[in-house]
Each structure stands twice: as C-alpha cells, then as structure tokens.
Amino acid sequence: GFSSIFRGVAKFASKGLGKDLARLGVNLVACKISKQC
C-alpha cells in the first residue's frame, strides 16, 4: 500500500538527504539570524 511505499521512500531519503536536511537547517538558522526570510 501507500504507507509501505512512503516508508521505503523515507528510508531512502534519510540516507540520501541527511546532508541536504542539515544544510537546510543551517540555511534556516542563518536566515533567522540575518532576518532575511
């Protein structure tokens, strides 16, 4: 079903996108600090 597909995608994403998420987090913090959101 959909949930198993989603779980598979989430597993794949957690491996591949960990760095991207970290970068997004850093960008978000920088954005908040500089108040340019």
Swiss-Prot record:
Task: Tell me which domain of life the UniProt entry assigns to the organism this sequence originates from.
Answer: Eukaryota
State a GO cellular component annotated for this protein: extracellular region
Which Pfam families does this one have?
A: Antimicrobial_2
Q: Where in the cell is it found?
A: Secreted
- Where in the body, by tissue, does this protein show up? Expressed by the skin glands.
Q: Could you tell me which cysteines form disulfide bridges?
A: 31-37
* Known role: Antibacterial activity against Gram-negative bacterium E.coli.
Descriptive protein name = Esculentin-2P
This chain's source organism reads Lithobates pipiens (Northern leopard frog)
